[in-house]
Each structure stands twice: as structure tokens, then as C-alpha cells.
Amino acid sequence: MDWLTKYWWILVLVFLVGVLLNVIKDLKRIDHKKFLANKPELPPHRDFNDKWDDEDDWPKKDQPKK
């Protein structure tokens, strides 16, 4: 078990290389042209800031000062 305390980082590197190889293998399986041909339409962006903007507390420029 002495070797494990000295060379634990090699096991971590082997694990990371295995993860990287599996990711590359899975990404090669994806057909991006087929996905782009059949991609769903995105719904319009809903912005709820319009209600917040109506409650503006800044003074209007054309109003006289009180």
C-alpha cells in the first residue's frame, strides 16, 4: 500500500484519460446535421421587466421642480 500513497496521481490521470476517451467516443456518435435539420423552434423570450419599468421613480425632465 506504500505505492498507493506515492503514485495515487497516476490512478487519477488514468481515470481522467478514460473519461476523456468516453466523452470523445460519445460525441462522435452525435449527428449534428440531423439535429440542426429537426431542431425545435424556441419560444419567444418573455421579459417581466416591463412591469418593473412602469413604476419608475425618477422625475421627468419636462416637469417643473417642486
Swiss-Prot record:
Bilayer topology annotation: Single-pass membrane protein
Locations listed in the record: Cell membrane
GO CC, any one term: plasma membrane
Keyword Cell inner membrane annotated: no
Region feature Disordered, mapped onto this chain: 39-66
Biased composition (Basic and acidic residues): 42-51
Keywords (A to Z) from UniProt: Cell membrane, Membrane, Transmembrane, Transmembrane helix
Residues that span the membrane, as ranges: 4-24
Family named by the database record: Belongs to the UPF0370 family.
HAMAP family per record: UPF0370
Protein name: UPF0370 protein YpfN
